[in-house]
Each structure stands twice: as structure tokens, then as C-alpha cells.
Amino acid sequence: MANPVQLFRRNSSWQKGVIRSLATDIIIHGRITTTEARAKILRSYVDKLITQAKTDTLASRRRAASFLRNIQLKDGKTSLQYLFASVGPKYKDRNGGYTRIIKLPNRQGDNSKMSIIELV
């Protein structure tokens, strides 16, 4: 069994970069297709980001800004502004469980377990 801390078998800076990019993508797009291992790790990070976005304070904005990538959207907002203006209020009455993982058939090239992770 693989060490859960080092699930990707890469160094920690690479893991953090991949998780940050995937978390930003799921906040912006609402759903992404990735491997099952990445989706399971990503779920906890996205849930924590949305929980912080529900309480719109300066401290929670700074905490989320330290993790999310600063991507400019088409409507002029950044990914952080979108998280706090659209995603956070959407889940105001929900206590956790903001994401869903749907399993897909294995990838054809290397037979990796694939899944879709999406916001509920």
C-alpha cells in the first residue's frame, strides 16, 4: 500500500502545485476529469476552501488567496473573487460535502483509474 502522504510518488512541491492547480480549476469550471487518487486528495482541499468562502472575512480571503492560483476569468473577476462571490454563498446552508466523485472507465493508454470530481 502506498504511503498516503506521498501518494503521487513525487516531491512535496510538485504535489502542492498540482493540487493548487486542480483546486483552482474545479472552483472555476465546477467539474474536472482526473485520476481517482488525485480526486480523493483534492476533495478535502476544495471542501476546506468552500467552507472558508462561506465566512467572507479578510482572514479567510487571505487564507484562500495563499492557496488558489490567481487566474483572471472572462468576466474580469479573479478566481478568488469568484470563489467568495459565487461559490461560497451557493453553499451557505450546506454543512460539508460540497464535492462528488463519479468513477469513469480506466484510461486507455495506461489503464489508470479515472473519475470526475464536481461541485454538488
From Swiss-Prot:
SUPFAM superfamilies according to UniProt: Prokaryotic ribosomal protein L17 (SSF64263)
A GO CC annotation given for this chain: cytosolic large ribosomal subunit
Record has Ribonucleoprotein as a keyword: yes
One Gene Ontology biological process: translation
Top-level taxon of origin: Bacteria
Gene Ontology MF annotations: structural constituent of ribosome
InterPro entries: Ribosomal_bL17, Ribosomal_bL17_CS, Ribosomal_bL17_sf
Keywords: Ribonucleoprotein, Ribosomal protein
Disulfide bridge positions per record: none
PROSITE patterns recorded: RIBOSOMAL_L17
Assembly and binders: Part of the 50S ribosomal subunit. Contacts protein L32.
Classification via NCBIfam families: L17 (TIGR00059)
Family in the record: Belongs to the bacterial ribosomal protein bL17 family.
Protein name per the record: Large ribosomal subunit protein bL17
Organism: Mycoplasma mobile (strain ATCC 43663 / 163K / NCTC 11711)
